[in-house]
C-alpha cells in the first residue's frame, strides 16, 4: 500500500540507489536510518522503489543516464558474447533501464555443469571472486564476481555471473508483476542497443 511515508522512504531509497549505487535492500534500510525511523517501519515494495528510481533519474540524471546505461549494456553484451555457451541472460537495473555508472551488471548463466562457467573464466585467465547470493527464486546461487573496464565510461564496472542450473531457464522468462520479461538473452540486449541511440 502506497502511503505518504512509504513514498518518502521510496524517494530516499531512490536517491541512495542512484547517487551511491546501493542495492535496493540495503538502500531501503539506510533510508530508514537517515529518516530516523524505527527498523520495523514497513518498507516500500520494489515496484514503488523502481518507480521512484525512474522519477529520480528523470529529474536529476536525464542528461547523463542514457549514455551510461548504453555503455553498461554494451559491456554486458561483451560478457554475454564471452559466456555465450552458458546461455547468458541480462537482469537487474541494466536490463530494466534504471542503471547508472554506479550500477553493477548481473548476468544469469544457465549451465549443464555449474563448474563449467568457472572453468571458462580460469581458462581465459580472468580474476574473479566466488560467492553465494540470493537467486531469483530466493534460493542460494553461486556467483562469480569480477571487475571489467568500460571503455565508454573509462572505469571499472562490477560484473556478476550468477550460475543457475539449465532447468531453471524454463521459469526464468515468466513476466514479472508488471508483465515485463525479467531478463533478456543476447538477442534481446542487442535489440535494446539498436533501439536506443546516444543523445
Predicted segments with their positions:
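Catalytic core of pol beta-like nucleotidyltransferases
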Residues: 3-21, 28-101, 111-199
Amino acid at each position: 500500500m502506497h502511503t505518504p511515508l512509504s513514498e518518502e522512504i521510496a524517494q530516499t531509497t531512490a536517491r541512495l540507489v542512484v547517487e551511491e549505487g546501493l542495492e535496493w535492500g540495503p538502500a531501503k534500510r539506510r533510508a530508514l536510518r537517515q529518516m530516523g525511523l524505527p527498523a520495523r517501519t514497513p518498507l516500500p515494495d520494489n515496484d514503488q522503489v523502481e518507480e521512484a528510481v525512474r522519477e529520480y533519474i528523470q529529474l536529476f540524471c536525464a542528461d547523463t543516464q542514457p549514455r551510461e546505461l548504453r555503455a553498461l549494456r554494451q559491456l554486458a553484451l561483451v560478457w554475454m558474447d564471452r559466456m555465450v555457451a552458458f546461455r547468458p541472460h541480462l537482469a537487474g537495473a541494466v536490463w530494466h533501464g534504471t542503471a547508472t555508472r554506479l550500477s553493477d551488471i548481473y548476468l544469469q548463466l544457465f549451465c549443464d555443469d555449474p563448474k563449467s562457467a568457472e572453468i571458462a573464466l580460469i581458462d581465459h585467465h580472468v580474476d574473479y571472486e566466488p560467492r553465494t547470493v540470493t537467486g531469483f527464486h530466493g534460493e542460494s546461487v553461486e556467483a562469480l564476481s569480477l571487475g571489467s573496464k568500460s571503455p565508454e565510461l573509462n572505469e571499472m564496472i562490477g560484473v556478476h555471473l550468477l550460475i543457475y542450473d539449465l532447468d531453471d531457464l524454463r521459469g526464468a522468462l515468466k513476466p514479472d508483476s508488471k508483465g515485463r520479461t525479467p531478463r533478456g538473452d543476447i538477442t534481446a540486449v542487442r535489440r535494446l542497443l539498436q533501439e536506443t541511440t546516444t543523445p
